Regions:
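Entry beta-strands of beta-propeller and related beta-repeat scaffolds
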Residues: 66-70, 112-116, 163-170, 222-228, ...
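Blade-loop segments of beta-propeller domains
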Residues: 83-120
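Beta-rich interaction/scaffold domains
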Residues: 1-33
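Structural motif
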Residues: 76-81, 121-130, 167-169, 173-189, ...
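Repeated scaffold domains used in trafficking and secretory/extracellular systems
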Residues: 50-61, 97-111, 143-163, 202-221, ...
């Protein structure tokens, strides 16, 4: 703890007051965040800032440093990044060899590394690129021939640090002819990327194409880690046992009609100050 005195003299040159200034590390709670400390930083109208909503949109977010990345996934709009504290636009994300037309979504890991995923119908090539900065051209992390019988690329999640230990999950979207209860997962262990695993989830029914699909998010960085999902229009938050992939309802009341016209498919998990958090954003399905 360091302290010093500061004397302030008034405009009359006589009146004065001495203050003691101390530099110290504040006390920190041992678990999670302090309830009531939430602060709304900004509120943006997407149309006003040049990100209009269309039926082709499949939006996703990423965070790297103090940069908030917004990717519309519409095939035409270059992802942009904003000051995460003020909401002011800074610039467009450097994509390098990744084309806007192929880009499906973006996400980020616990260390601020960004993943960019391409769209892939059944039988086509699905790619994940990585970068450590919004201004550094991404490099290829992996390519996978999509043999799931479904579409991929609109929702990808990551838990952990892709340079050490992480779990990457790409949702398989439903199509016009088939619903989906599958995702593809990659496990990174000690910086080494493992083989893709196609996983079928038991007891969740079937989700559809965007915007009726789900983002599958996991608690940990192993193949046995439990995970969560929720999709329109059942809007049920499922907790899934990572060992047997059997689902249980985490919010049973959401299937009694109370969630009509809502779309509860925006979710993520994060660790903070020794606590694990699940975030579920409940939005209106109809404009």
């Amino acid at each position: 703890r360091v302290s010093s005195d500061l004397t302030v003299i008034a405009h009359d040159g006589v009146t004065k007051q001495t203050y003691t200034i101390q530099k110290a590390v504040p006390d920190k709670i041992p678990y999670g965040y302090r309830k009531g400390s939430e602060t709304e930083l900004f509120k943006l109208d997407m149309g006003v800032i040049g990100l209009p909503w269309t039926g082709a949109n499949a939006p996703s977010l990423a965070v790297s440093g103090n940069n908030l990345v917004v990717c519309l996934g519409d095939g035409t709009t270059t992802p942009a990044y904003y000051n995460a504290s003020t909401g002011n636009k800074i610039g467009n994300v450097t994509l390098g060899s990744v084309s806007v037309a192929s880009l499906g979504c973006m996400t980020s890991d616990s260390r601020g590394n960004i993943l960019l995923a391409t769209k892939a119908t059944n039988g086509k090539s699905f790619s994940i690129y990585k970068t450590s900065s919004v201004t550094t051209a991404p490099t290829l992390l992996t390519t996978y021939t999509n043999n799931t019988g479904l579409d991929m690329g609109t929702k990808v999640s990551v838990q952990g640090d892709i340079n050490t230990n992480a779990s990457i999950i790409a949702t398989c979207d439903g199509t016009a002819s088939s619903g989906s209860n599958k995702f593809v997962r990659w496990i990174i262990t000690d910086g080494v990327l493992g083989s893709p695993q196609v996983v079928t989830v038991n007891g969740v029914g079937n989700w559809g194409a965007p915007a009726s699909n789900t983002k599958v998010v996991t608690k940990g960085t192993t193949a046995q880690s439990d995970y969560f999902l929720s999709y329109y229009d059942s809007n049920i938050l499922y907790w899934v046992n990572g060992t047997n992939n059997n689902a249980s309802k985490s919010l049973e009341d959401s299937d009694n009609g109370n969630s009509w016209a809502m779309n509860n498919n925006c979710l993520d998990t994060r660790s903070f100050n020794n606590a694990q958090y699940l975030v579920l954003v409940c939005t209106a399905h109809f404009p």
